[in-house]
Amino acid sequence: MAEVTVKSLAAEIQTSVERLVQQLADAGINKSPDDSVSPQEREALLAHLNREHGGSSDKLTLQRKTRSTLSVPGTGGKSKSVQIEVRKKRTYVKSDAAAQQAEAEALAKREAEEQVKREAEEQTQRDMAELAKREAAEQAKRQQEEQAKREAAEKAKREAAEKEKVTNQHIDEKTKAAQAEKAKREAEAAELKRKAEEEARRKLEEDARKVAEEARRMAEANEGKWTENASEEDNSDYHVTTSHHAREAEDENDRQVEGDRRARGRGGKAAKQKKGSKLSESKADREEARAVNRGGKGGKRKPSSLQQGFTKPAQAVNRDVVIGETITVAELANKMAVKGSQVIKAMMKMGAMATINQVIDQETAQLVAEDMGHKVILRRENELEEAVLSDRDTGAAAEPRAPVVTIMGHVDHGKTSLLDYIRSTKVAAGEAGGITQHIGAYHVQTDNGMITFLDTPGHAAFTAMRARGAQATDIVVLVVAADDGVMPQTIEAVQHAKAAGVPLVVAVNKIDKPEADPDRVKNELSQYGVMPEEWGGEAQFVHVSAKAGTGIDELLDAILLQAEVLELKAVRNGMASGVVIESFLDKGRGPVATVLVREGTLNKGDIVLCGFEYGRVRAMRDELGREITEAGPSIPVEILGMSGVPAAGDEATVVRDEKKAREVALYRQGKFREVKLARQQKAKLENMFSNMVEGEVSELNIVLKADVQGSVEAIADSLRKLSTDEVKVKIVGSGVGGITETDATLAAASNAILLGFNVRADASARRVVEAENLDLRYYSVIYDLIDEVKQAMSGMLAPEYKQEIIGLAEVRDVFKSPKFGAIAGCMVTEGVVKRHSPIRVLRENVVIYEGELESLRRFKDDVNEVRNGMECGIGVKNYNDVRPGDVIEVFETIEVKRTID
């Protein structure tokens, strides 16, 4: 064996000598370029390189491209070249050494097989190329001969007949020789191709037999040790043909194309006639072959990713549908995986019409989903709210607290005067019109303990205020005037107290008046379930006089006695909670809320969550306007610092985190809006007809501003109750605080009148009012406001017309006039007859005609009127059937002004 030097080894492995010397040095072998390298050193170098550069990959992918050019004859004798590219790809997975050796041997066998096949294909392509060249030469020769033939034919016409015969014979001989030569060449080409195909087939069969035998032996020796991974073929192109079946399909397709080409060459006109059918057949063949190629190995290839993979479900799928408090129809349809039209159809069957974007409530959505066969899961969306409200310090021991007493009764029965005497102040004189229009909250220190009083309005408009007062109280003091007795608001106060489950203490006021009758009050109240203690009931009756101060101490004792029976207790230490008694917007201080603390201690700086609003308590004041820093149970306070004006009656709760309080307030606002939209089902079937029947109804638009929230509610409710079938009151805007430019602009846009109750318009609002000529009115007493709105509504009512008889004339005779026709000679028996007045003709007290008096004369003179007891001639317009004895009734139509009752 010849020695292998470093230089020869570098040339053999195709690398530079310097790099090989460096690699040998890295492997611990110091050599110069001329030194010899032993086999052991070569193995050490190979092991070093394997360690440095890592072993071979577990996967081996072979990609081959074979390009060839095929010359195909085209139309007009021209040949065109077609580029053919065959792409092949195969992936192998490395197993152990034996598997690698077997794989290498199998790969060598396959390469030999492919080499034989390629040689056969190349030989066939060369033969076809030679054949195409010969055919092209023959085609050119035939064209030349045809040209010569045409020239000879033209020449033959000019020459003699004997020359034409000689020329034709010569041409026929040449044509026959050319055809014989062509047939001979075609036979030779077919024989060559047949021999090449037989040789290739024989080699393939022999190689396949050898490969099968070798594979059988290797499978027996190394069973289960090597597998070929063909997974990569799934993602390869459709042109990748690696299986034996695919190669056979390609060969068959090539043979068919070649046969079609030859048939076109031989067929002549017949081939042209069958061109369409041949094209369709060859296209079908190509589609079939392409389908075979796509089949891959053993038909296991996956379908194309472009194919539709959806299969229609055999039956409806029942889903778990999660529904919140509100949901749109489109969202519900998506959760059930159905079309929105199906949900709308189901709702219409249930009697509700809805659009696809309409918000529906939880109950409706639950009914629809269950009707369509799905399981409903109701979701509670107020988890954050509950978590915030439950995270409070309320575990301290309860202590006795002062009672909260509400003074209720009919208007002008002396509620505020009674409370005045107790507080020793003059509050009643400060109220406009001498009536209470706000809830006043006061706490009074008596000899026997502290009492918190709430003074509610007695007017009918303040029903909601009285209801809030009854809910926030422990004891109700019902004030009844001894001279008036039980009145409508007295009965209403009894109903509120019973609904809230609050005990009653009856104060019979104005006992010092001569016409006072306390027994009458007891009898009337007993009809409504309020029985005195002396009659076996539970209600305490105390006779008082707010002016003279009679019985005040007895009333306080009765209140404290009732409080002891109730055993009122509250947690004093801890986070406070209470109820909003009243709220308003102060121009200098912002939103102000009067809060009655129920439990805990409200401190300055606490974070308060109140309905839709939240905020930090910036300042606290008592009912006298004094600054305080804390307020315990049963103490009413004014707090500043809320984000907006809370609604009266809202729960005020102290929480820990301002951020969470803001989230809860925003959630409540959103929920309120969604629920409001869900309940506005104007598209329901039962409402459609009522909307159509209403027709044209006059509307009185009003923008209302008041000083406190309770007054806004009371006035708005009273105004809405004034609506009739012909005129409706529509409050387009309402709020707490002064009249601003925005309010004036809204009134101008909606053609509304501006009403201010105990508030005034600012300078910018007044400018808009003057520019737009708006109707702006101020009020301080609710009676005046309601009366003027009634007058405005009366002006919008359609007028009524009344017919009033002004005169009667008896027909004595009838004569003719060439100008007016029949003229009735009459005697005025009653009233006055006026010209151009409407009349009725009565015959035997039955109206037979109604028209107009056209002509009125007395002694040939036209007159405007004829009085009682005088004769006249009357011409009735467009009526000539007047007879003696008829009565002509003259009347006027007068307008009667209507009012709102």
Curated annotation (Swiss-Prot):
Cellular compartments annotated: Cytoplasm
Q: Which family does it belong to?
A: Belongs to the TRAFAC class translation factor GTPase superfamily. Classic translation factor GTPase family. IF-2 subfamily.
Q: Quick one: where's region Disordered?
A: 48-313
Q: Where mainly found?
A: cytoplasm
Q: Which UniProt keywords apply?
A: Cytoplasm, GTP-binding, Initiation factor, Nucleotide-binding, Protein biosynthesis
Q: What is this protein called?
A: Translation initiation factor IF-2
Q: What does this protein do?
A: One of the essential components for the initiation of protein synthesis. Protects formylmethionyl-tRNA from spontaneous hydrolysis and promotes its binding to the 30S ribosomal subunits. Also involved in the hydrolysis of GTP during the formation of the 70S ribosomal complex.
Q: Which GO terms describe its molecular function?
A: GTP binding; GTPase activity; guanosine tetraphosphate binding; translation initiation factor activity
Write down the Pfam families for this protein, in alphabetical order. Answer: EF-G_D2 (PF22042), GTP_EFTU (PF00009), GTP_EFTU_D2 (PF03144), IF-2 (PF11987), IF2_assoc (PF08364), IF2_N (PF04760)
* GTP-binding keyword on record: yes
Q: Where is the composition biased (Basic residues)?
A: 263-277
Q: Which gene encodes it?
A: infB
Q: Name one GO cellular component term.
A: cytosol
Q: Where is the composition biased (Basic and acidic residues)?
A: 106-226, 278-291
Q: Extract the ranges annotated as region (G2).
A: 434-438
The record lists the organism as Edwardsiella ictaluri (strain 93-146)
Q: Which NCBIfam families match?
A: IF-2, small_GTP
Q: Annotated region G4: where?
A: 509-512
